[in-house]
Amino acid sequence: MARVYNFSAGPSMLPEKVLKQAQAELLEYGGSGQSVMEMSHRSKWFDAIITDTEATLRRVMNIPDNYKVGFFQGGATQQFAMVPLNFMTTGKADYIVTGNFSNLAAKEAAKFGEAKIVASSKDKNFTYIPDVNAINYDKDASYIHICQNNTIFGTQYVEVPQVEGVPLVADMSSMILSKPVDVTKYGCIYFGVQKNVAPAGMAIAIVRDDLLGHAADNVPTMMNYTTLLAKDSMYNTPPCWCIYMTGLVLKYLENDIGGLANMQKINEAKAKVLYDYLDSQDFFNNPVEHRYRSTMNVTFTSPDPDLDKKFCAEAADAGFVNLKGHRLVGGMRASIYNAMPAEGIDKLVDFMEKFRKENA
């Protein structure tokens, strides 16, 4: 069977070249006589893998030396608790709620202190991003938290909050590595890897040095950033396969794509094809304010929920899978992460136009 175009929000497509390299090395890696899946995390081979993966991430993202990088189990959802447990030193933090995951992060933080929602786009069903320069931030907040791209509702920030003396913490799960990011604007960046980096099973956190070491003594060992970061992510057995796959994807971005600036151009061109089509007709509708449209997650609906179901079923039969929208939104969602080839977008648009003509 031919490979399908997988528009899943995560786990999602991986570059075919990366998959083929992993396939070639699956049974035996680098003269070790064993698979990465079965080798000791203390072996010289895996030590080289994790060291090289971190070094490549630092190069690709231009991460300064005063930031630590850690490979964590538990996904981004675990980070919702780790952030307040480690950083909420004043007992309060500001949260901007622009969708489901930022709302869940705020709810989790409220278990450990005052998680003040200083702005929200819920009033328009999360179809825009609040003006970050018009928000009344708390100068005594321990940090400001955002979700930089909203997977479910298809929005993204065009600028981020910058408040002197208050660190910015960002969940970048669904946009990481899609474009260059100025790491110095953030105190902490975290992301689950299953959308744009690697298979499911890991989160990566990038934490500025001055934010570490302030967790209370009763914070569980594995919920303390310092535990893993002080041991170069080797305090316990790390998610070895995910780290290996992350390394392959990063090398692909660096060597084949030519870095994140090139990746951004490719992604913006792909998204433009789909948005231009959506704007050219009145059968399918994208509700997001144009300025805040996500480059990674494109949401749309047809005139009727039954037609939405029909579209998703016929699309799957045609080789376009996982287009069903999130249960909170309905409709359709095309997640067009880094690994989605441009031809996948072109063919999807052709299918959408065919469906429109047959069902309008």
Language-model regions: role of each:
Residues 2-4, 330-360:
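PLP-dependent enzyme catalytic core of the Aspartate aminotransferase-like
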Residues 3-54:
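A glycine-/small-polar-enriched, mobile loop at the entrance of the PLP active site in fold-type I
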Residues 10, 109, 120-176:
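Active-site phosphate-binding strand-loop segment of PLP-dependent enzymes
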Residues 33-79, 86, 100, 108:
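Conserved N-terminal alpha-helix of the aminotransferase class I/II PLP-enzyme fold
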Residues 77-144:
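PLP-dependent aminotransferase-like
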Residues 188, 193-275, 289, 358-360:
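Active-site C-terminal subdomain of aminotransferase-like
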Residues 284-314:
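Conserved PLP-binding catalytic core of the aspartate aminotransferase-like
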